[in-house]
Amino acid sequence: MGVAVVGDSTLDVTVRPSGPLLPGGDVPASIVISAGGQGANVAVRLARRGIAVRLVSSLADDAAGQLLRAALEREGVELAVVEGTATGTVVALIDGHGERSMISDRVPLDGAEGFADLNADWLHCSGYPLANDRSGDALAAMLGERSVATRLSVAGGSLEPKPGPAAIFARRVARAHPDLLLLSRDEATAFLGADEGSMAAQAAAIAALQPDALVLVTAGAGGSAAAGLGLSLVAEAAHLDRPMLDATGAGDAYAAALIAELGGRTWPPAAADLQRAMAAASELGARVARVIGAQARVDGEAEPLP
């Protein structure tokens, strides 16, 4: 199976303060600088499973861009670079429970519609370029014109809880006609404009709006729910003894594992196959949340190229 991923690649600065931030003060912290980005995270996790993957992303020829290119090449990810004037940076502020709050300086993915491999077996699109007003409309049109043999998954992009941006994103998703739509619970609430009460209800409500898609709503330790295409499933989260350290990239790991498990199977998947895929995705997402960094390696993943 070959996968093309359209999405961001960023330099991540992960900050774990030793205590509450003090306005005007100085708080000791653990700070890690590493490769990240929703699109790159998915691509790297897929490559570590031995899947041929191509990443369409925007990188500049600056120090950060050179670092990220080298890291992706070591992971075996084929790059189709959209040359940018700067490389995106994300600061992830991690609280005492491992939950992250992000401060982002993302770079629009201008021109991605001319680079994506529409003949891939599976095409995955990060939500950030689809939500961006500079790239979203052209990208949605390109995705909607893909080959009928290419499966498309679309992820959320930290949707703003405001009616305007969420409605625009929903329209672009509808134009892209994804086979699989992946949203966090907060993203699902923004997408619908209201909290439907449960993940299962959220997934069902979104599936009614996107009748050609299988919709998955995830909530980390709260599990996940799927609806659409005649399927309706709820899966518990994987339970690990170790505490969560950094949730950054856990959802991207979930997406990568789900694609790896479902790719090559008949569509829509059988309920049993989807249940197994959701369990495997939850397991990888949980393990990634127990390490620091969105692309930090976990047990069982292939080592990078020398």
Feature locations, PLM:
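Glycine-rich phosphate/adenosyl-contacting loop at the front of the ribokinase-like
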Residues: 1-56, 66-70, 244
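Conserved phosphate-binding/catalytic region of the ribokinase-like
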Residues: 3-4, 167, 195-306
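Residues at secondary-structure transition points
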Residues: 26, 30-37, 63, 86, ...
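Short, conserved phosphate/pyrophosphate- and ester-handling motifs at nucleotide-, phospho-/glycolipid
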Residues: 46, 184, 251
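Ribokinase/PfkB-type carbohydrate-kinase core domain
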Residues: 1-9, 70-82, 94-234
